[in-house]
Amino acid sequence: MSVLEVKQLCVAYKRTPVLHGIDLPTISPGQVVALVGPNGAGKSTLLRTLAGLLPATGDIRLGSLDLLRCNRRERAAVLGFMPQTLPDGIALSVLETLLGALRGGDPLAAQGSARQKQQKASDVLEQLGILHLALRPLDGLSGGQRQMVSLAQAVIRQPRLLLLDEPTSALDLRYQNDVMSMVRQLADQGRIVVVVLHDLGLAARWADRILVLERGRLHAAGTPEQTLTPALLEQVYRVQARVERCSQGRVQIHVDGSVS
């Protein structure tokens, strides 16, 4: 079983430290882990570092694979990353974009005839409910549609580690829950999923574990019940709030006011 281990992770930007010796609890396959925290806490920086996109010191291991020091092909074979936004100026269709993502990863994942690869891409699009967009140019899509295509790119190679940066940010309420339900299914198939979320209600409903970041440090880690408390919300977000746990795992956070 390939667990994810992160020890003493440090990142600096122009010699200014932004992540300070982060040690994460061991994360096992089948778990959805949400990274939460206020703006500037280091959530996206941590996720991009896990994806191998930022230089860092420390240790990141997925099973026996050293993710900080392995080569790009080794990393691409096990890891899927969804950025906050896709770059503009991509003239390819959605289907062509997915086929490119398939070719860019594990050589074994890219094996098969052109028809088999197209079928694999179509299956992912259908699973996400966006098969009707297959032939549309990426630049002609709405923000929410582009978000769904970005998720499709991240999952098409069936990675063992899936890193998602705000996958629900441009989606309406229906699609937010659809996407998080899909994320849950991907984890249940034996993957590790680490997802940045601003919506604490979504984090509480869908995550097995929540990691709370503040100013580049790990402030708290545990289950939603252990972490999303009025005391923590006051300490980290500087708000006075009440946490109400409703039916079907839903959580409502009522903010009464800010703390000066």
Where are the predicted features?
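Conserved ABC transporter NBD signature motif
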Residues: 58-66
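The feature captures the beta-strand-to-loop junction immediately N-terminal to the Walker
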Residues: 36-38
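Conserved ABC ATPase "signature" region
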Residues: 99, 114-133
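A short, flexible loop at the N-terminus of ABC-type nucleotide-binding domains that lies
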Residues: 1-6, 10-27, 69-71, 89
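Helix-to-loop junction immediately C-terminal to a conserved catalytic motif
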Residues: 51
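Catalytic Walker B motif of ABC-type/P-loop ATPase nucleotide-binding domains
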Residues: 162-166
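Conserved ABC ATPase signature
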Residues: 137-141
